[in-house]
Amino acid sequence: MAIILGIDPGSRVTGYGVIRQTGRHLEYLGSGAIRTSVEDLPTRLKRIYAGVTEIITQFQPDMFAIEQVFMAKNADSALKLGQARGTAIVAAVNHDLPVFEYAARLVKQTVVGIGSADKVQVQDMVTRILQLSAKPQADAADALAIAITHAHSIQHSLTVAKQSSQAVSSEKEQILALMKTRYSRGRFRFRN
């Protein structure tokens, strides 16, 4: 069982979503947005840090997943987004949370099945996957999608590890059986 906090960073609106993963089952715990007003950037970053810290304190997540920065046409916007993202990551690291990063395209591919999905499609699929009674707001839905992507990544890693372990175990058993057969027939000769 793991509680995952997903963050969709932004210098004006930072979405968050919290889910609990138990095996393949995902449970919605909460979501929303940290909104900053038209203050100067340092004050907005301070609010983002305080907001993420409050969410971490409230939900006690085990893992922190955040969207990677994409290359924006406007360099100033990209820098502000990077600073907001860094602020959220610092809040997570200060609470000893492991940080996982996912590209927006991968998040959309994982949740919707199409890497170029729009916000409405993401909201619809998040609502279905988490069996919510109402659609979450766009920024919260994106954050929940990031958390779902991380949960999927964990489940996929466990499945691959289990399959690898079974394959190694099976191969080991085959080698031991072959060695027993050859040994019982006297085919092994030991040299000094």
Curated annotation (Swiss-Prot):
Superkingdom of origin organism: Bacteria
GO molecular function: crossover junction DNA endonuclease activity; DNA binding; magnesium ion binding
Entries under InterPro entries matching the protein: RNaseH-like_sf, RNaseH_sf, X-over_junc_endoDNase_Mg_BS, X-over_junc_endoDNase_RuvC
Binding residue positions for Mg(2+) 2: 67
Class of enzymatic activity (EC top level): hydrolase
Alphabetical list of PROSITE patterns matching this protein: RUVC (PS01321)
Cofactor note: Binds 2 Mg(2+) ion per subunit.
Known partners and oligomeric status: Homodimer which binds Holliday junction (HJ) DNA. The HJ becomes 2-fold symmetrical on binding to RuvC with unstacked arms; it has a different conformation from HJ DNA in complex with RuvA. In the full resolvosome a probable DNA-RuvA(4)-RuvB(12)-RuvC(2) complex forms which resolves the HJ.
Protein name per UniProt: Crossover junction endodeoxyribonuclease RuvC
